[in-house]
Amino acid sequence: MWDTTPATKERSGKDCFMANTTRWVKTHCSRMDHGGCALLVRAEENRIVEIKGDPDGYLNQGYVCLKAFASADRLTHPGRLKTPLKRVAGRGEGRWERVSWSDAIELISDRFIKIKEEHGARSVVFGQGMPKGPELFALVRLANVFGSPNVVAPQDVCHAPREVTGIHTCGFYPVADFHHPSKLIVLWGSNVTSTNEEGQICSLLLKQLAQGTEIIVVDPRKTALAEKAKLWIQLRPGSDHALALAFLNVIITEGIYDKAFVEKWTYGFPELAAHVQPYTPEKMSEPTWVAPEIIRKGARLYATSRPSALQWGNPLEQTIHTWDSVRALICLMAVCGNLDEPGGNVQANEPDLLELGKFVRSDLLPSKRKEMIHAFHGTIPKMMTVPSAYLRRAMIEGVPYPVKGAYLQGTNSLLAYAESKLTLEAFMKLDFLAVSEIFMTPTAALADVVLPAATSFEFNDIGHYGLGHGYVLARPKVVEPPEECWPDLRIVNELGKALTERQLWFEDHEEILEAVLKPSGLTYREFSEKGFLKGPERFNKYLSSGFRTPTGKVELLLSQAEKFRVSPLPEFNGLPENPDPDFPLVLTSCKSRYYLHSSYRWVERLRRHRPHPKTEIHPETAARYEIHDGDSIIIETRKGSMTQVAHVTDKVHPGVINSAYGWWFPEAEGAFLYDWERSNYNMLTSTERLGKAFGTPNLKGIGCRVRKAS
């Protein structure tokens, strides 16, 4: 019998998790990925013994990846953090003493209040890794109530460029609609059968393919889907904006765009048409490495196959040209009539939930947008979090003002932020650093206080997809956490009581879940029984109310470009880096299906599948440098070097090196930060040049060279 009842005050503790009981719980995956997969989890005596996919799952329909099967291993790992720790030696030396939760909370609050008194509230920042539930919004609330405008998260290289550019261009974030049939799906830098930041839509895509939908894959690597595609476009890493502009050139020049939609619902089409004339397939073939006839074939397929969905991936947001890449692709969706159409790219509608602005208490910090660190660097409005490059400048140089303290939850920033050496320098300069984690990481090892977090299956949770997808998922508790491991939501709630006025917080952190759900008319128990909430499906909304832009139309020509100091039309202003004969190869990276960013290298079941950091190199290139499969190799850029293991494969272009990201070694010594430098991709990246709109660094398309390690 399935149990969907959450462990709440109505049904908690021993009543819910009695010994000598076996129970199945319907829940959703979390913290191994974004968490879209519905799961059936079996627990015995407060221990998870079986996990499988739920065939009734809205997104995954029974499919789950290896990470889901291994997710319970985190809960019982012998190296898990189980008590608050305080540093008793030099920062990063790996010497700790156990402290109580009350002492840890008091120490953090005392130090942050002292920094606030000496430097102002904005000199304390609050940081989040990849958001997975309401804990990010609780953290934003904590910052606002405390008086700091600064929350740091990886939005500048993940989601925000697509979301914010969409809002400015067409009034919403256009996501691929896999719930309705498409004639064609374009996977642009999106490897949904292996890794997928959008939530698990792999099964929905495979279902469409089985029903005859064709696909185009735009990717530097020959992915599994590239081998099945109608067309695989193997572009040079970091040249997405050039290829998208060439598509626009073909479609407009040949007159195969949606003339009725363009005439009535776009602003600036004549200007765009004139602007893209120079971006011919012949001219764009050189920077993209794509033959002109392939460019034409791809453009024609997309324009003449309606509806077409463009599923775009994270790589688009990882160069200094992300604004132009994303703008060009939204223009492409618009001129081909695929915006707000079933089976095209659509706007999700949220279910009835507590308004975000009210929950995070934006009213307490009305000047926030002007006071955030990146506002002083001229980024485009609507960025909710601070780009990491600008954060570190504040920590190291005091620009635009000093940052002296930080609280981080669920982020291994030392590995995640570009140009890792600067992250180490920045954290070493802090007066105080506190970290919430489930396992000691290189970042946690630098902290003054480390707090042991509960992880998924150990607390009631809401998976929030909000802006992008319009649904929220129930993640009811399955087992009790170790006694001193707290959910991040509880940690933030208790920190809020210590740092600010208690009446601004909740008596119990689970009241936050009830508050979020209240507008829906459901309690958390009722929500868990339903499994998920989805906003209503509405298409072609522009027919009655236009688009939510200043002109009421899709702004191919951005009407507020001068105000935001950005280009009004998408441009090609070169590659991420200019070619350099000293670094003749092009470096890129991709995520592993076995890990989530830098997480879970310590989960043995996953590590067995990928024990070493792998760099893909083409056979011709390997032969030139006398490299064999399995060799240790050194990859170098202008910024630094790292060592990984060579994997010789024709899945990459001879001019491309594809390296693994997020690697550190939990088996190494904590006093040396777990060999964080050895194979760390971000030892090779730079923040010297940043994208104007979002402060995005170049993580792809970087000049490099390789050699065999001695």
State each model region's role.
Residues 129-130, 264-267, 302, 345-356, ...:
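A glycine-rich phosphate-binding loop feature that marks nucleotide/adenosyl-phosphate handling sites
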Residues 137-207, 211-218, 241-245, 331-445, ...:
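Extended redox/cofactor-interaction regions of prokaryotic respiratory oxidoreductases
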Residues 229-235, 454-464, 470-481:
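Short beta-alpha connecting loops at secondary-structure transitions
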